[in-house]
Curated annotation (Swiss-Prot):
Provenance organism: Drosophila melanogaster (Fruit fly)
Keywords for the protein's UniProt record, in alphabetical order: Leucine-rich repeat, Nucleus, Repeat, Ribonucleoprotein, RNA-binding
Subunit field text: Interacts with the SMN complex.
Lineage: Eukaryota, Metazoa, Ecdysozoa, Arthropoda, Hexapoda
Family designation: Belongs to the U2 small nuclear ribonucleoprotein A family.
Gene: U2A
PROSITE patterns recorded: LRR (PS51450)
UniProt-listed InterPro entries: Leu-rich_rpt, LRR_dom_sf, RU2A
Name listed for the protein in its UniProt record: Probable U2 small nuclear ribonucleoprotein A'
Length: 265
């Protein structure tokens, strides 16, 4: 397995694909988790993470340019909620050959209002009853599902089905499983965080990224610059770093007039 580092990102192949989009090729490294994608500096329309060892789709920094994620042949079984805030313009996600099991596992994708292409072939979920009807109902903007067009008659049939008692019961069951899955994920993450001390934190939003850039300009030592640059590239804010940013905001020019704040980790 290879860790997804800023160095790997910078060394990987970058090119203009046949759709005339700028693409980053991160295929086949057996990467176990998504991290440090902030190092892309939001320069890509497509990121290809196929043929890796991902189990969760999570930890995406703010990448408003990103329109397509290729995630074929991983082991993804969970999609984190709220990713639409990180990649609001995502229009295509290809998840062929993963391990998504239930229709409730797809609920986190509903927030992507520009998602027009989804592929879930060779996932257990694609064989579930009412799969295609559910997707047509939940994703009104979806045009291609598993490389087959969703037609207006498909949407109408889906809407009619989910108005029936059977359809409403199906939606209730999906919602129940989705809530259970989300609660289990939160509990698991909380448990994992107990031994990490201050390494938790959250994903950086655009305002955070701007504050980090300003802090880099004001840094008074190389160590501070390197630390801030690492955080900027990863897109992940450690807990203590949030306190440091608050100190910078409160103190204006910073300690001793230099704008530098001690970085204690």
């Amino acid at each position: 397995m290879v860790k997804l580092t800023p160095e790997l990102i910078n060394q990987s192949m970058q090119y203009i694909n046949p759709c005339r989009e700028r693409e980053l090729d991160l295929r086949g490294y057996k990467i176990p988790q998504i991290e440090n994608l902030g190092a892309t500096l939001d320069q890509f329309d497509t990121i290809d993470l196929s043929d890796n060892d991902l189990r969760k789709l999570d930890n995406l920094p703010h990448l408003p340019r990103l329109k397509c994620l290729l995630l074929n042949n991983n082991r993804i079984l969970r999609i984190s909620e709220g990713l639409e805030e990180a990649v609001p313009n995502l229009g295509s996600i290809i998840l062929t050959g993963n391990n998504l099991q239930e229709l409730s596992d797809l609920e986190p994708l509903v927030g992507f209002t520009k998602l027009e292409t989804i592929c879930l072939l060779i996932n257990p979920v694609s064989t579930k009853p009412n799969y295609r009807e559910y997707m047509a109902y939940k994703f009104p903007q979806l045009r291609l599902l598993d490389f087959r067009k969703i037609k207006q008659k498909d949407r109408q049939a889906a809407q009619e089905f989910f108005r029936t008692k059977q359809g409403k019961d199906v939606l209730k069951e999906i919602s129940r499983k989705s809530k259970m899955s989300a609660a289990a994920a939160i509990a698991a993450e909380a448990g994992n965080g107990k031994g990490r001390g201050s390494e938790g934190g959250r994903l950086a939003n655009p305002q955070d990224m701007q504050r980090i850039r300003e802090a880099i300009k004001r840094a008074s030592s190389l160590a501070e610059v390197e630390r801030l640059s690492q955080i900027l590239q990863s897109g992940q804010l450690p807990d203590k770093f949030q306190h440091e940013m608050e100190a910078v905001a409160q103190n204006g020019a910073g300690h001793n007039g230099s704008g530098a704040v001690a970085m204690e980790y």
